[in-house]
Every structure is written in C-alpha cells, then in structure tokens.
C-alpha cells in the first residue's frame, strides 16, 4: 500500500510500505480522509521524541471497513486504544489509561496511508449523508468537546456562560463550535493571524477578533504557549476557569499568584474519553457543530507540500484533510 512516511526532521515521503495487517478483534480500514494535526507537525519538526522516524503519522481519520461481517461500513476512527481493564478505563476515563496506545505512535502506525488496522471497539459508524472529510474531523472536534465539557463542569453555576477561545486553529474553532453546541452563545475567538482571521470571518458563523479587552468566566487555551497561558491568566474572571488543551510549549506564562488569590481553576485536558468521542460524532451527524466547511482537501500524494505549507504559515484553513485515493 501507499503511505506518507515521516523519515526525519521536515522530511515526509509518499511511498510503498507493507500492507496493514489486522490483529485479533481488529478490522482493516480503507482510509478515505485523514487530517493533519498539530501533533503531526510537532513530529515533522523533530519536536516529539515519542514519534521517531521512520513512522506513518496521522490519527484523525475516517474510511470503510474491508472484509468481515461489517464489510463496507463507513466509520470514523477513535485512535486511542486502551486496555479496558484498568481503573481509568473502567471509570470511563480511557484517555488516562497507563497502557494506552495511539495510532501514529509506536507500536501502531498511523492513518496517512491507504489502509490501517483498528479494534472494532474504536470504530463509530458514519451515516451516508456525512462525508468522509467531515467524519475525519471527529477526532480533533472530540479533543475540544472534552475540554469544553470539563471547563463547563468546573464553572460555578452563578457565572455567566460566555467564553474566550485563544487560537483560531482547528482545536480553537472546534472549541467554539462545542461551546455553541453546549448552549454557550457568547463565544469570542482570538486569532492574531490576519489570513486565518479573515478566513474564519468569511464563514459568518464565528466571532473572531485580533484582540479583546474583555474578561471571561471560561477561557480555552487552544494553543498552549507561554504567551497564550499569560493571556488566559489575565483574561479569566475571578473564580473562573482556564481549560488548557494546546501543547505548544511545556512551561511558562501562568500568573500563579493571581490564580491563587482569585481562586481561578486551571484544568489540563488530554484528548477525550470514548463517550466524548461518540457524543462528538453524533453532534456532527446531527449538524449541531455546523457545516464544518473550514477545511482544505489535498491528495495524500501531495502531503509533503502540505506539511511544508503548514510549516511556512501559508495555509489559511484551520485544517488540511489528506485524501489517500485522490
């Protein structure tokens, strides 16, 4: 089969690789769409020791089951494979399983390929009216769904339901959409890039600004750099909540004194639970997350150029979806 293989820092190649082989209780999936995630970019830039070359990246994917009793079923893939036996798994927090695996990280190859093998329990069927490109957005949308859910659960019930989202990339946009789906009507996205901001404003569905002087009960940091954490620390109201989902850099930015004296809650949020993933998929199917028309589709064979364009900051769309059969 063909795959886009990470071969070293800023090097990916579209080439032949051994066919994906399902294990026991797994299905072979013909990949129809796979999105480029920020973590794929971290690996591409050589910033992720967990993803050593050579490796097939990609974990945001949808496709069709090949063979077996579910042959032909259209599915979106939950890439987190958990043990199902530990206390975290049994309590519905599979994302905290100590033995979890994820495709695109050894020992599991990723979805920037024509085929991938996945456990049956990680597949959610996709109705015919939902495109594969839209279904592939379930994974990044679930990341934000999880962050928003935790943030709203922590928010004091007397506080206004309004939120600031820092960052207009896919995770930030997804957070704004999840907030709206959870009945938070006053949502502002801060995005400094003129091109990205103009692109998002053109959709007409999002309130995107370059900067704001307001403060907010809930702040979602969808970037995760010291500068954005500093902004979150400044913009959150006393008694409010910061939900941190971005993984830009490891340290710096938080005003711990202010957070302590004003009882600001800080929540680290990692991926999603299986239930978050299912709920996100259903929200997509029901149209509660909008038209999801803020993506750019490219052929997987042109993946090297897509990574370069993202590296050079010349992509206006929040998400590039790679199509293996284009």
Language-model-detected regions and their locations in the chain:
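Glycine-rich beta-strand-centered segment in the early N-terminal region that forms part
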Residues: 18-34, 48-87, 127-129
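Cytochrome P450 core scaffold surrounding the K-helix E-X-X-R motif
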Residues: 39-43
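Mid-domain Rossmann-like dinucleotide-binding core that forms the NAD(H)/NADP(H) cofactor-binding site
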Residues: 130-213
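Glycine-rich cofactor phosphate-binding loops and adjacent beta1-alpha1 units
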Residues: 154-164, 182, 197-265
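Rossmann-fold dehydrogenase core element
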Residues: 241, 254-293
């Amino acid at each position: 089969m063909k795959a886009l293989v990470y071969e070293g820092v800023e090097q990916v190649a579209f080439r032949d690789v051994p066919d994906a082989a399902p294990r026991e209780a797994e299905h072979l999936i013909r990949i129809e769409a796979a999105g480029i995630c920020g973590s794929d970019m971290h690996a591409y830039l050589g910033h992720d020791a967990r993803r050593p070359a050579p490796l097939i990246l990609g974990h945001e994917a949808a496709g069709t089951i090949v063979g077996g009793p579910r042959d032909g079923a259209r599915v979106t893939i939950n890439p987190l494979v958990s043990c199902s036996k530990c206390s975290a798994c049994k309590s519905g927090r599979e994302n905290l399983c100590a033995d979890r695996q994820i495709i695109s990280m050894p020992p599991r190859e990723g979805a920037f390929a024509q085929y991938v093998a996945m456990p049956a329990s990680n597949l959610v069927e996709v109705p015919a009216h939902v495109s594969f490109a839209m279904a592939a957005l379930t994974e990044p949308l679930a990341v934000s769904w999880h962050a928003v859910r935790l943030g709203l659960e922590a928010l004091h019930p007397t506080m206004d339901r309004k939120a600031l989202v820092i960052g207009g990339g896919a995770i930030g946009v997804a957070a704004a959409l999840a907030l709206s789906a959870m009945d938070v009507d006053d949502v502002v996205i801060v995005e400094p890039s003129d091109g990205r901001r103009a692109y998002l404003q053109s959709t007409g569905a999002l309130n995107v600004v370059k900067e704001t002087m307001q403060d907010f009960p809930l702040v979602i940091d969808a970037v995760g750099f010291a500068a954005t954490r500093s902004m979150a620390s400044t913009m959150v109201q006393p008694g409010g909540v910061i939900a941190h989902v971005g993984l830009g850099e490891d340290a710096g930015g938080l005003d711990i004194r202010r957070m302590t004296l004003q009882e600001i809650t800080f929540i680290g949020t990692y991926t999603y639970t299986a239930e978050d993933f299912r709920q996100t998929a259903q929200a997509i199917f029901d149209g509660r997350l909008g038209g999801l028309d803020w993506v750019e589709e490219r052929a997987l064979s042109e993946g090297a150029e897509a990574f370069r364009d993202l590296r050079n900051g010349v992509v206006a769309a929040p998400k590039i979806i790679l199509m293996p059969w284009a």
